[in-house]
Amino acid sequence: VEGYADPHTWHDPVFWTETVIAVAQSMSQDLDLMVSADRIATLRTAARLIDEWITQTFAPIPVEQRIVVSAHDAFSYYGKRYGVSLEPLLGLSTASETKLARVNELVDLIAERDISAVFSETSVESAGIAALREGAAQRGVDLRSMPPLYSDALGPADKRGGQYFGMLIENTINIVDAISGERPSLSPSAQIFLEAHGLLATETLL
């Protein structure tokens, strides 16, 4: 909503984890509950491992190539932390209307910067993204079909994207694939740690 702060802080794993810990500690004092120091340490380690992996994953990609076209402005915290330029079709609110001028602006960007993919999102209606695809096709650009990004909600509980750290992993894999054409693998140390502490589903990463 215009005039309100960006609420999408969960796309920065370190910032979000510290927020969750602070809220839990505050609530525990109000409700006279105990917050496990071991659990806090586990979450901080998990956030650090994911943060390091995402940073290392983007490291080989030149900054000028790190451009993501998405359905709405949900990934600014992610972009700021990892040096990714975000070009959303809509603003912070998914209720805003797609403007033809913005569609045309993004089509120009896609053609000029040789962007290979645009992202729909699991929680956003994708008509605007379809318009981008059509506009790009008219300019001779055949955009790749990519899985939608998780923006405002997690995925189904039985999928990797249904868990917080899994959501970050899947988004990163798909973003890097769209930019570089390569699908990175999660570091073994991060995967083992997350699975051992119930923070990541034990399924094969694509």
Q: What do these predicted ranges mean?
A:
Residues 1-206:
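Extracytoplasmic metal-acquisition and chelation regions
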